[in-house]
Amino acid sequence: MAETAVINHKKRKNSPRIVQSNDLTEAAYSLSRDQKRMLYLFVDQIRKSDGTLQEHDGICEIHVAKYAEIFGLTSAEASKDIRQALKSFAGKEVVFYRPEEDAGDEKGYESFPWFIKRAHSPSRGLYSVHINPYLIPFFIGLQNRFTQFRLSETKEITNPYAMRLYESLCQYRKPDGSGIVSLKIDWIIERYQLPQSYQRMPDFRRRFLQVCVNEINSRTPMRLSYIEKKKGRQTTHIVFSFRDITSMTTG
């Protein structure tokens, strides 16, 4: 039986609101759980500076003590997680597909490294990064096309693919916390950068779909179900339906 998440609604309400452009939600990239956690904190820092600004210097900091407090770690564990995750950002890029630039089967895209600098100050107990300035517009000055959720909604998720799926669902979440969205399997594999073996439906179902749905149901305030949509004998889409546990208990 899946573990049921214990949701503290007051803490959830007071938790930082993570807001990012839908372009970033739909982008192709692969990050670890700890890298995703840091990205959430960076997004929060950038938007707290002034959500109306069109420019930001891109310099963000992570205090070891604060990170440890947020994610329930010791200082040593937090410092190790931060150090390893930041180091592993090297060589990783985020890809934004540009359909208007497509030519035949060849896709148009823009690809960016996440950071242009990272630093560590042991004497102050903090790490800092300089986010690629080309990425700043995806975090600030957002008008209509954005995805939002509370940090507390995702902090217990351990699977980075479940984090990506949760963001995709939140992109289509209604004000009452419910939603239905159909995602193409090929799109999920491409944008979440899943292993090539997941193109086989049994592997996709067992290693991605079931694992992520179970984790979201047990570790977030979302209650999620799905059906597989077929074209002939081939499964092509996954249709997700979800509700927020708050609406389920108060509605």
UniProtKB/Swiss-Prot annotation:
GO BP annotation list: DNA replication initiation; plasmid maintenance
GO molecular function: DNA binding; DNA-directed DNA polymerase activity
Recorded superkingdom: Bacteria
Residues annotated to bind DNA: 75-83, 200-207
UniProt cross-references to InterPro entries, sorted A to Z: Initiator_Rep_WH1, WH-like_DNA-bd_sf, WH_DNA-bd_sf
Keyword DNA-binding in record: yes
Key words, A-Z: DNA replication, DNA-binding, Plasmid, Plasmid copy control
Keyword flag DNA-binding: yes
The family this protein is said to belong to: Belongs to the initiator RepB protein family.
NCBIfam families, sorted: PRK13742.1
Subunit structure: Monomer and homodimer.
Function: Replication initiator in the monomeric form, and autogenous repressor in the dimeric form.
This protein's name: Replication initiation protein
Organism of this sequence: Escherichia coli (strain K12)
